[in-house]
């Protein structure tokens, strides 16, 4: 398992705002994990560990919550934080089955300088994200689209995107244009 995805946690049995304050006073963050057909679990996570990894998260980052006995595959669903102090008050995680494919929208990251744009063309982005299907741990953070070979008058279609080997397009029409250079 990729170590950057693993987040250590401990279960907690006491709840409420006063208990949450005690947890935060110990430099930990109160959290909950829920999922379809799953019981809600209450956790606490070390602030330093979460904050170190939190800066690198996207909506598609799949984490592994590890309590020493059980590893749970989760997405960060919500983070409650104080904007001024940057103190995280609470985290909601959504648990998914790591062996069941899911569909999720993934951002398209444009890279390279298009030949068509260098020749005076105008780049029009029609789609900023694409729906893909994969196992949770295979879900990419983004899909790269290299614009370097795209000429003036060309367009790039969904079916032209280069996806990782374990990821499939889940859009209804793969002939939709992603970008056009006019």
From Swiss-Prot:
One of its GO terms (molecular function) is 5S rRNA binding. It comes from the Bacteria. CDD domains: Ribosomal_L25_TL5_CTC. Keywords: Ribonucleoprotein, Ribosomal protein, RNA-binding, rRNA-binding. InterPro entries: Rbsml_bL25/Gln-tRNA_synth_N, Ribosomal_bL25/Gln-tRNA_synth, Ribosomal_bL25_b-dom, Ribosomal_bL25_C, Ribosomal_bL25_long, Ribosomal_L25_dom, Ribosomal_uL5_bac-type. Pfam families: Ribosomal_L25p (PF01386), Ribosomal_TL5_C (PF14693). GO terms for cellular component: cytosolic large ribosomal subunit. Signal peptide: none annotated. NCBIfam families: bL25_bact_ctc, PRK05618.3-1. This is one of the proteins that binds to the 5S RNA in the ribosome where it forms part of the central protuberance. Belongs to the bacterial ribosomal protein bL25 family. CTC subfamily. Part of the 50S ribosomal subunit; part of the 5S rRNA/L5/L18/L25 subcomplex. Contacts the 5S rRNA. Binds to the 5S rRNA independently of L5 and L18. This is Large ribosomal subunit protein bL25.
